[in-house]
């Protein structure tokens, strides 16, 4: 396991001043192009939640889709995309949440989850925790119950773990923490 984490850590690239000056973006695309690292991410997250009885895995737009879909496959679960406002056709539930200087809205199809289903939320990064909580709220609007949150990278200095601490069904599995 330590070798897998080291491989992932080595492949995450810092991109200074992206998307704006002063921000150091953590780019996971080199990790995705490495078959060993990508396989490790998927297998480690699926393994961590294998005993949770996951019915569906929710992937958060956009890079969360890349990790969540194969995790769902490994768990024998369905995959549900959560997208930004206006990107899903048909009837949706929406949840608007606060960002540092603005708001954002996530949406899910109204028929994506059934009452009582156990869902795992997967994204590429845990930053402030706002997107994770918004996704949990969407799942609950459909009557589902979250069983955890999995991600490749946790940006600990942004406080997402603290925000999710004590939130039922949002136990965190982050493969790499910085």
Which residues fall in each region the model found?
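PRPP-associated nucleotide enzymes
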Residues: 1-178
């Amino acid at each position: 396991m330590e070798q897998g984490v080291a491989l992932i850590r080595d492949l995450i690239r810092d991109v200074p001043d992206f998307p704006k000056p002063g921000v150091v973006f953590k780019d996971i695309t080199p990790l995705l192009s490495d078959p060993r690292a990508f396989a490790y991410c998927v297998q480690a997250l699926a393994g961590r939640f294998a005993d949770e009885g996951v019915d569906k895995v929710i992937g958060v737009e956009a890079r969360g889709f890349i990790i969540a879909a194969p995790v769902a496959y490994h768990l024998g679960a369905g995959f549900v995309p959560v997208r930004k406002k206006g990107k899903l056709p048909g009837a949706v539930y929406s949840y608007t949440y606060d960002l540092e200087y603005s708001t954002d809205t996530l949406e899910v199809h109204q028929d994506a989850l059934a009452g009582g289903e156990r869902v795992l939320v997967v994204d590429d990064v845990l930053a402030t925790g706002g997107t994770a909580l918004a996704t949990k709220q969407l799942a609950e609007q459909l009557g589902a119950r979250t069983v955890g949150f999995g991600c490749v990278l946790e940006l600990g200095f942004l406080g997402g773990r603290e925000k999710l601490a004590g939130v039922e069904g949002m136990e965190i599995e982050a493969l790499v923490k910085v």
